Amino acid sequence: MSEIVDIYAREILDSRGNPTLEVDVFLESGAFGRAAVPSGASTGEREALELRDGDMARYLGKGVLKAVDNVNNEIADELIGMDADDQVAIDNKMLELDGTEFKSKLGANATLGVSLAVAKAAADEAGLSLHKYIGGAGARELPLPMMNILNGGAHADNNVDIQEFMIMPAGARCFAEALRMGAEIFHALKSVLKGKGYNTSVGDEGGFAPNLKSNEEALQVIMEAIVKAGYKPGEDVLLALDVASSELFKDGIYTLENEQQKQKTAAQLIDFYEDLVNRYPIISIEDGMAENDWDGWKLLTDRLGKRIQIVGDDLFVTNPRILKEGIQKGIANSILVKLNQIGTLTETLEAIEMAKRAGYTTVISHRSGETEDTTLADLAVAVNAGQIKTGSLCRTDRVAKYNQLLRIEEELDDCALFRGHDVFYNLKK
């Protein structure tokens, strides 16, 4: 009864007004799954290919009708008749059909849409929530959220170099409380920014995007907002950064336009981070070095990897092969997991399992171009990731994930776990 009888893709819009892919999967029993695919702004060089049409007469070349056609024809022809509950076989069939390292034939947006829609259809067939279907009886840990409340870099039209300044309400007793704390700090930050005469428009991920005097001023206004909301920095709330350093790196030098010393070597940039970590309750730095600066990554990990979470995003691109090399070389201590970087659920789960076996933490993440799809909320609980990064406390495309986590926590009731500070299990206390 779990046999796939139809697969259908369509072109829809993401949160930035760009086309993306949505896929429906129908089973013989009448069970149904639907998934929409996200899209990134700052992307790693080794990410699986997001197939776009390139036809400038439609959506400025960003249409996805080629990917839609690949799903409705080539992929559907191969998968119709297969069992939806055999996720590995289905994903492997698509990998075989594509035959390229980065899914450049079918497009990772095509394969991911199908992969996730199949999982949702199988969950519907089994009468299970998606997190229970993927993770089984042990899926019960609600993630500590990384809330991106101030944006810079490629996520905003301002003069701030660092792409994301995030809060982590680690002192909360449950996810619902963490969400409330984050929302209160978000509104306090708006008040702080207004009081200083700054613009309170928001960026792609719902965080404020003011023109500030320096990158450090972003930390200062967030600290002020935490206190204004009635919380203690370092106890109730921790800070996290996504530097997106690949965007700042050229010819072996990092350029931060908003700093007095604009150009920095890898060692000087690490000195800059260490100084911030010493003065602010920063627990996590993502993409602190450029994706191809592996020597810089090693220096950063050796210097700060026992004290804070060093997260690889563009570095690892959710790719088990690249992650394995990083583990062997002692680079980073955490992986950011983005489903569309690799393009199938099976490969995503493989990367998560590999990271956990190596003692790396895992952070399940959205992209800057999102939809109302809430799959990543279920995935975070399914794999007991412990952390999720899904934007600020406004914009429905971000809040949809938080609201889904509230529902999951309610469903799990007394079985739900929320670890707070303890999610950083690989750091020295």
Curated annotation (Swiss-Prot):
GO biological process, one term: glycolytic process
Biological or metabolic pathway of the protein: Carbohydrate degradation; glycolysis; pyruvate from D-glyceraldehyde 3-phosphate: step 4/5
Cysteine-cysteine disulfides: none
Keywords for the protein's UniProt record, in alphabetical order: Cytoplasm, Glycolysis, Lyase, Magnesium, Metal-binding, Secreted
Catalysed reactions, semicolon-separated: (2R)-2-phosphoglycerate = phosphoenolpyruvate + H2O
Record Gene3D superfamilies: Enolase-like C-terminal domain, Enolase-like, N-terminal domain
Subcellular location: Cytoplasm; Secreted; Cell surface
Family indicated by similarity: Belongs to the enolase family.
UniProt-recorded name of the protein: Enolase
Organism listed in the record: Pelobacter propionicus (strain DSM 2379 / NBRC 103807 / OttBd1)
